[in-house]
Amino acid sequence: MTDIARIIEVVEPEAKALGFDLVRVRYFKGGEIGDEEHTLQIMAERPDTGQLVIEDCAALSRRVSDRFDELEEAGDVLIEDAYRLEVSSPGIDRPLTRAKDFAAWIGHEARVELSELLDNRKRFRGELKGFDAETQAISIEDDGVVFEVPFDLVSNAKLILTDKLIAASRPLDTSGADEILEEQED
């Protein structure tokens, strides 16, 4: 059994060493129909931009791979199965995994799933209205009703792609794009 908490314990310092915040770590089998391979998915971001560029992803991937190799050589095998390592930026319709994610995206639409029933339901979809840091509760308006959702009940949440979200998001880093266009024109 793969211990995600242990993997996070190893990955987070590697991300921090590069100046990144860890957004999410997931370990899953498949992803596409017929795909039996396991994937270790690591999402991270630069605190100032909320994204990573490809070079950042490559740097974190190398650090994590090297650290996992060191631990394995010392007899500490974190993942028994063969797996694919996937390092990425959270993207525009990002997952909301930390309290600060909910606070940062107030006013935007989100889909929130809970680990147990709240008002006879586990799924909410609507505008994030607030986050109470003291009670650790998320306010989300769904069909005109505002629900107070305890953060510790959230099992999965992500932003919903809307025009408002696109307008509010920082553009991706386009450095190097001119060189690519010039090469294609020649």
Curated annotation (Swiss-Prot):
Q: Which Gene3D superfamilies match?
A: Ribosome maturation factor RimP, C-terminal domain, RimP-like superfamily, N-terminal
A GO BP entry: translation
Where does it sit, as one GO cellular component term? cytosol
Q: Which UniProt keywords apply?
A: Cytoplasm, Ribosome biogenesis
Q: Which HAMAP family match?
A: RimP (MF_01077)
Report the protein's function: Required for maturation of 30S ribosomal subunits.
In the record, the note on similarity to other proteins reads:
Belongs to the RimP family.
This protein is called Ribosome maturation factor RimP
